[in-house]
């Protein structure tokens, strides 16, 4: 290692097109401006390239399936199912996905088999008086580790601020979002 930091400046325009009811295509290209890294950072490359379809389910539940090239060099498929109570105070959800790597090295797009399985079960409580959400989720991450995450989110008009804490792989972490 000859650098104590890595820096990357990219321009990454994206477009989202509604195709039909509930369907969307998202396309992004990443244009490198400057970096002190080696590898894919030197090349024009695909960013997010996804096709998603939202759908309703009996009893007021809803879902979304998404396939394509995601962030963090992942490509695969994701299924998300949610149910919110009629007053929207409670929301319950499950999510599952299968992915492989998607990288761009030496001018070639390289993908692996979709073998990494992830999933989550989540519950959200909305406190209306202070316009806050409290989320609790248990997760299985793509490398097989399990974890729990708690979020406290406050909405101020069009601005949102939150805190989170998580525990996975024997380590605790937290921060702001």
Predicted regions and their residues:
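Outer-membrane beta-barrel proteins
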Residues: 26, 36-39, 74-76, 101-105, ...
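Short helix-loop boundary/capping segments
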Residues: 108-109
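Transmembrane beta-strand segments that form the barrel wall of outer-membrane beta-barrel proteins
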Residues: 1-2, 25-35, 58-70, 91-99, ...
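Short amphipathic alpha-helix initiation/capping segments at coil-to-helix junctions
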Residues: 112-113, 141-145
């Amino acid at each position: 290692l000859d650098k104590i930091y890595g820096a990357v400046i990219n321009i990454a325009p994206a477009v989202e097109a509604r195709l039909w009811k509930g369907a969307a295509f998202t396309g992004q290209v990443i244009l490198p401006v400057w970096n002190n890294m080696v590898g894919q950072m030197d090349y024009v490359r695909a960013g997010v390239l996804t096709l998603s379809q939202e759908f309703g389910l009996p009893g007021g539940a809803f879902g979304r399936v998404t396939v394509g090239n995601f962030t963090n060099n992942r490509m695969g498929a994701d299924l998300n199912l949610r149910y919110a109570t009629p007053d929207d105070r409670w929301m319950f959800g499950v999510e599952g996905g299968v992915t492989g790597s998607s990288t761009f090295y030496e001018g070639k797009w390289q993908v692996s088999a979709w073998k990494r399985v992830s999933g989550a079960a989540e519950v959200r409580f909305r406190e209306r008086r202070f316009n806050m959400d409290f989320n609790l989720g248990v997760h299985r991450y793509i490398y097989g580790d399990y974890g729990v995450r708690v979020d406290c989110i406050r909405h101020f008009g069009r601005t949102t601020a939150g805190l989170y804490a998580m525990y996975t792989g024997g380590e605790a972490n937290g921060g702001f979002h």
